Amino acid sequence: MNVFWEHGYEATSTDDLLRAMGIGRQSMYDAFGDKHRLYLEALQLYETETGSELFGRVTRAPSPFVALCDYVLSVAEGSSLDLSRGCFYVNATTELAQSDPDVRAMVRASGARCVAAFEEILKEAKRRGEVDPSVDERVAANFLLNTISGLRVSAKAGVPPNDLRGIASLAISSLKPR
């Protein structure tokens, strides 16, 4: 996963993958089929790991909304610290989603799952009075997903960390009761 994440699909050679995995060419083909299939599996692993992080935060936090806010702020912090890699899914979107139907389908499905999870968190937060009653949870969930993606792209483009934190804080405050 890390080789694709750091270099992208096109810039990663089969030899790069073999060296990173410490296996022979035939073993890779036997296990994964081809480079493309391995890339799709790496994307799936990334989604599983990042989804587990958010789920863990939600289950440990005093409220799901607090966890979501912390997650958005941590994206701003983490994005500013890891400029070279960015977000694997954002990278896949910008590199391949337009030309690769498999990647496009994975990115869309992952985004839909993320929006659904955010929407449920926002519904619960609204019920608890943590989110403004006028907020449309579906629109806000999409807004947060796009804010997170934008933070990651902006960090990769060199936007200063304080600006990233400010963007994340503004996104969160726009949802709170007025």
Question: What is each model feature region?
Answer:
Residues 41, 54-85, 137-144:
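Hydrophobic alpha-helical connector segments
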Residues 67, 81-102:
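Amphipathic alpha-helical segments used for helix-helix packing
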Residues 78-79, 124, 144-161, 174-178:
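Amphipathic C-terminal alpha-helical segment
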